[in-house]
Amino acid sequence: MARTSSSFGFMGRFGRSHDLRELDKALRAADLHPMLVPEGVKLATVNLMKDAEGGEPPDHAYPYVADMLAFCALGANGFAGANGIERLEAVEARLTEAVETGDGLDAQLVLLALHAKLLHPGIIEEYGISAEEQ
């Protein structure tokens, strides 16, 4: 199946692609304003999602990804304050697994957030996250 291209839009004339609109909506729902996330990070995120899904991700996949990005950017306290303890515990478990395995969509999202300087200092310290060349 051919992968569709994502689009930022152009001068208000051509609209943003569906995947970027869905990611923006999911980021807002996770209490991370989309304007705080660079467009390049959002584009890379939807491309990582497409790679993981083997095609277009379903709409229900965006909140899952947005929770990880919001947790990375807001830190544990900020995320919990906006999203509750249950969602905090779920995303913390996902981050722990991503750090331990170093593989998968969550690990790629954390690495993307680290390189984009979106990773909260408390998260870096608590989980010992760093990017090392091999």
Residues covered by each model-derived region:
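Charged, amphipathic alpha-helical linkers/stalks
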Residues: D19-D31
